[in-house]
UniProtKB/Swiss-Prot annotation:
<dbReference type="GO" id="GO:0005829">
    <property type="term" value="C:cytosol"/>
</dbReference>
<comment type="function">
    <text>Required for cytoplasm to vacuole transport (Cvt) vesicles formation and mitophagy. Involved in binding of phosphatidylethanolamine to ATG8 and in recruitment of ATG8 and ATG5 to the pre-autophagosomal structure. Protects ATG8 from ARG4-mediated cleavage.</text>
</comment>
<keyword id="KW-0963">Cytoplasm</keyword>
<dbReference type="InterPro" id="IPR048720">
    <property type="entry name" value="PROPPIN"/>
</dbReference>
<feature type="repeat" description="WD 3">
    <location>
        <begin position="419"/>
        <end position="453"/>
    </location>
</feature>
<dbReference type="InterPro" id="IPR015943">
    <property type="entry name" value="WD40/YVTN_repeat-like_dom_sf"/>
</dbReference>
<dbReference type="GO" id="GO:0032258">
    <property type="term" value="P:cytoplasm to vacuole targeting by the Cvt pathway"/>
</dbReference>
<dbReference type="GO" id="GO:0080025">
    <property type="term" value="F:phosphatidylinositol-3,5-bisphosphate binding"/>
</dbReference>
<keyword id="KW-0853">WD repeat</keyword>
<keyword id="KW-0926">Vacuole</keyword>
<dbReference type="GO" id="GO:0000422">
    <property type="term" value="P:autophagy of mitochondrion"/>
</dbReference>
<feature type="short sequence motif" description="L/FRRG motif">
    <location>
        <begin position="310"/>
        <end position="314"/>
    </location>
</feature>
<dbReference type="InterPro" id="IPR036322">
    <property type="entry name" value="WD40_repeat_dom_sf"/>
</dbReference>
<comment type="similarity">
    <text>Belongs to the WD repeat PROPPIN family.</text>
</comment>
<dbReference type="GO" id="GO:0032266">
    <property type="term" value="F:phosphatidylinositol-3-phosphate binding"/>
</dbReference>
<keyword id="KW-0472">Membrane</keyword>
<dbReference type="GO" id="GO:0005768">
    <property type="term" value="C:endosome"/>
</dbReference>
Amino acid sequence: MKVLRFNQDASCCVVNSGANELTVYNCDPFGKCFEFNISNVNGDSNDNGIGYDSLEAGSSSIESQVIAEMLFSTSLLAVVDKGQGINTGKKLKIVNIKKRSLICEIAFPSLIVDVVMNRKRICVLLDNDQIFIYDISCMKLMETLDLWESNNEGNLNDHIKVGERASNMINENLKNGNELDRIRSKSNNNNDQTNSDNGRSRTYSINGSHKIKPQLTLSGNDNSILCYSKYSSSKQNPARILNDIVVYDALNLKPINYLNSVHKGCVLKTSVSIDGKLLATASEKGTIIRIHKTGVDSDFASGPLLYKEFRRGSRPSHIHQLLFNKDSTLLVCVGDSDTIHIFRTDDDGLALDGIDGDIGSDSGGSLELIKNRIPHEQVKKFFSRKIKSHIPNQNLHRDFAHINMDRIVHTVVGFPEEFDNKIYVASDDGSFKTYTIPSKHGQCVLNKTSHFI
């Protein structure tokens, strides 16, 4: 079993429960909402939607064979089944999970790596380093982006056509956003259950080889701020480094900002805040977590784009999830270590203390010249800063709160929108846990443990 991911407001959790079966669980109260077979969502499924014809149940593979992205509390689910072969891995299905019916299916020229969506846009990342952006109301292709192209101009002539039926059915489902809310009130039983997980994986396979997966993250609000990692070298350069970030307005289809070399190595994981103003990044090493201003607000030009910097730990870790809460005051970091870290982003004392531009620009001047221009104490401060700027920072701020986990348990987390001080933890040992985040520095308190069936 694999826990795939929470929906955008953490009201539901989608689980790949084995052999092409997807199950949607309500988080509060905890319980099963829907289950259906991925390969039979076109209406030809049996009564309970369960079938076993491709994946091995209980697969121990770290990377799930299924991508599933749920649209808030609606009945819309975007699904990619890579377990049926190469051709199915190139197809995106938009399904109605309540009716177990296929709304539309889109075939792409290459394997699908990731899918993200909100109420306005759905974005699809392919393994040929292209991003397809769709209007979710009618599934019209709005733009294509190339991770190698400097101008990021899409080719609308290569769009994939979807019929009127898709547009009408999607609009109908978007209007029925309270379907799961009604079911949620009935799901306060069935708490006896088992699970597993997947975060979005570190690498993906192409013809047996592995490469770092480009990152794709979309803001939860209707502004649809899309942030994606981009190669900092030319396509001919074998040393492919994914450490540049493009901030893109997916609603108005125009680039907003370009963040250059956010880490020394490849960017392994990203997350954008709900309002699209902040972007969190982690590299392959996973010891440093950085928060950047995306530049979507008018105040970004008044200061550096690097907003906050945290030390997760001294040992390297594969980070597979970063997530902001709804107010962007907390950032959770999940890796393959035995601790889940929660950082505070709203403490002014944590802001980076940059070097003054006018003093720093005098680095080529003589000591005597500097003494004549600024007082003695400022001279000392100047040299302290210059020396410090060339020494790795060993005193970065650490987590505000944490959760101790079994190291072997792969985990996905969610911040429930309706509970400010809670966090959900779904793990591949079959547990679903609810924790309270402390008001002061310390360990999160376990409130409740449930189990996936």
